[in-house]
Amino acid sequence: RVSSAVSSLVSSGPTTPAALSNTISSAVSQISASNPGLSGCDVLVQALLEVVSALVHILGSSSVGQINYGASAQYAQMV
């Protein structure tokens, strides 16, 4: 599931705000389906851990190039 989350996040690009939401939603659905006995809280915690793992993997395999400070306002709006 983590590799699926990585693929989903990378393919949607860095400026797609819905990508993270969709990835979390997908992880929640998959975890709920494969572990019907888990509580909603447990499912959410597991999903968030998997998404954070995916983000760490992406950051770990990325290389930072030239930074466009002029576009920082656009990225700040996403947060």
Swiss-Prot record:
Family per similarity comment: Belongs to the silk fibroin family.
Protein source organism: Araneus bicentenarius
Compartment list: Secreted, Extracellular space
Entries under InterPro entries matching the protein: Spidroin_C (IPR021001), Spidroin_C_sf (IPR038542)
Superkingdom of origin: Eukaryota
Its job: Spiders' major ampullate silk possesses unique characteristics of strength and elasticity. Fibroin consists of pseudocrystalline regions of antiparallel beta-sheet interspersed with elastic amorphous segments.
Keyword Secreted belongs to the record: yes
Assigned keywords, A-Z: Secreted, Silk protein
Family matches, as Pfam families: Spidroin_MaSp (PF11260)
Complex and partners: Major subunit, with spidroin 2, of the dragline silk.
Protein name per the record: Spidroin-1
Domain statement: Highly repetitive protein characterized by regions of polyalanine and glycine-rich repeating units.
GO cellular component: extracellular region
